[in-house]
Curated annotation (Swiss-Prot):
Positions of region (Aspartate): 207-210
Residues holding ATP: 229-231, 238, 497, 549-552
Annotated localization: Cytoplasm
One GO process term, biological-process aspect: aspartyl-tRNA aminoacylation
UniProt function note: Catalyzes the attachment of L-aspartate to tRNA(Asp) in a two-step reaction: L-aspartate is first activated by ATP to form Asp-AMP and then transferred to the acceptor end of tRNA(Asp).
Protein species of origin: Leptospira interrogans serogroup Icterohaemorrhagiae serovar copenhageni (strain Fiocruz L1-130)
A Gene Ontology molecular function term of the record: nucleic acid binding
Catalysed reactions listed for this entry: tRNA(Asp) + L-aspartate + ATP = L-aspartyl-tRNA(Asp) + AMP + diphosphate
EC code(s) of this entry: 6.1.1.12
Gene that produces this protein: aspS
Protein name: Aspartate--tRNA ligase
Amino acid sequence: MKHWIQENYKNRSWAGELNESQEGKQIVLFGWSFRFRDQGGVIFIDLRDRTGIIQVVARKELLGDSFTLAEKVRSEYVLAVRGTLKKRDLESINPRMQTGTIEVVLDQLEILNVAKTPPFSLDEFDEVSEELKLKYRYLDFRREELKNRMIKRHEFIFAIRNYLNKRKFVEIETPILNKSTPEGARDFLVPSRLNPNQFYALPQSPQIFKQILMVGGMERYFQIVKCFRDEDLRADRQPEFTQLDMEFSFVSQEEILSEIEGLVETIYKEVFNIQLSIPFPRMTYNTAMEEYGSDKPDLRFGMKLVDVSEIVKDCDFNVFAGAVKNGGTVKVVCVPGGSIISRKEIEDYTAWLNRDYKAKGLAYMKHGTEGLESTITKRFKKEELEAISKACGSKEGDMLFFGADEREIVNHSLGALRLKLSERFETPKENEINITWIVDFPMFEWNKDHKRWDALHHPFTSPSDESIPFFESMETLQKNAGNATAKAYDLVMNGVEIGGGSIRIHSKEIQNKVFQVLGINEEEAKEKFGFLLEALEFGAPPHGGLAFGIDRMLMLLTGGKSIRDVIAFPKTQKGLCLMSECPSPVEEKQLQELKIKLAKV
C-alpha cells in the first residue's frame, strides 16, 4: 500500500464536510465510488463516505500514465484519493448535492479494493424490495435512507443518555440470562449445559430486576436494553427490540409523567428539531375506548365513535333496539365525504370486521340531499334520524357506519374501521405529531376464553388510591376486580403506543392479593417471583417507572413503514435473518452436550 495512504488515515477529510472555504487545499479522502462518468480524457467520480458525496475529477493531462488507474474504477470500488479542492464552474454546479459547488481535482488515486456489481441500485431514489435489502444489509447501509436513520438512532440514544445523566439517573445493566416467567408472550429459552434439563429465558423486559434495584436504594435507574419476545410478528414487532427502561423511587405518578415530558420534549428538539408543547394532553382509558375504540387512539383526526343507544332504543329496527335491550350498545362513526364508498367495499368491510372482531354486521346510512338515506331508514322515525345526524354532526356527502352489539365488540370493530377509513378520508397533515397520555387503566381484564382475570398491564402495577379499599380482603377484591383501576399510564404518538408504565406495588401483602386474583397460588408465586416477594420485605420504597419503545419512536420520527427500517439487522416477519441465514440447525455434538434430543416435525 502506498505510503501516503497510511500516513493520512488519521488526517483524512470527510466528503460531506468539505466546503468552498477550503479552496486550494490539498485533500485526502477515502470512500466508495458511487457514480463514474468517462468523458474521454476526463473522468468524473462521485466519491461517497459516511458523511456525503464529493465529485472527484481525473484529468488525463494532469495525471499522465496514472489516468489508466482511474479508467479501471467501477461502481462501489474502495478508493483512496488525494487532490486539490476547487470551486466548480458555474455551469457545473449541482444544486442537488450538498457539495455541489466544489470538486476535488485528482493528484493521486489508489484502488484499495474492487467490488462485484451490486444486486440492486444504491441510489436513494430507486425502489428496492425489502427482501433484497435485508439479504444484502451491508449494501443497504450505503444508501442514504438507512445510513441516515442509523445516525439519527445514535443521536437519539446519545441525547437520552445525556439528559438522564444530568437528571441523576444511573445506567445499570440487568441480566440477559433470566428466569422464565411465561405470563405474557412466549419466552426465548436457552438451555443450560452446566445444569441439565434447566433453562434460562431471554428477558421480555427488565421489570423485576429494576424493581429490585429500587429496593436496593439505587433510586433512579435507566437502561438502553434489548428485550426478547417469541411472538407472531407484525409491522411494529420484532423478536428482539430495544427499550429505554426507567425506574424511580420516592415518586408519584404526576412526577413521573412530568419527568418523561421533559425528556421527550428535549430529545425531540435536539435530534429532530421538533418543538413540542408540554404538558401533554391526558385522556382516560375509558374515554379512549368509548370515543375511539382503542387504548392508543390516533387523535390527528376526528371521526369519533358516538353512542346513539338512547336515540334508537325504541326504534323499529330490531338489530339496534335489540342490542340495547340486551345490555349492549349502538354507536355510529361518521365518515366525511364517505358517501362515495361502494357497496362492494362495504361488503368487504363487513366480512373483515366479522372475521377479525366478531362484529355481526355493519349497518350504514348515507347523508343525502334529504337527510339520512338507506335501506333501513324506513324503520326509523324522522325525529330519530335527525337526532342521529345531529349527534354525529353529519352533513350531505357523509357516510355513517353503525355497530350494534356488546360494548367491547362495538368499540373494537368501529375503532378499527375508523382507522382504516381515515387512510382515505381523514389523512393527517404531513409531519403532524400528536402525543397524549392515556391514564386510569383498569387493573384487571376478564379473559373470556380462560374464565379468569388477567393483569391489563402486568402483575406488579399498583392500584389507584380509589381502589385501595378493594384490597382490604380477598372477598372484597374478588367482587370488585372489574372495578379496580391502576396507577398506569401509556404514552401514545399518532396512534402508536411508544411508552408505558406504572407505579409499582411495594407491599408484599397487596402483591400477594394481586397474584391470587390472577389465579397464581402461593407456591407458584414463590417459584416464579420468590426473590421479588422476599425483597419487598426488606424496606421497599414507593417506586414506579416506564419503558419506551425506541424502535417504534424512531420509526415514527423518521417516516419508516416498519421498525425494521430503524434496526440495523432486523428479522423478517417469520423471524429470519436473510443475511446470516439464522435460525439454523446446530451440530449433533452441541445438542448432546445440552442433553437435547430433537423431535420430528
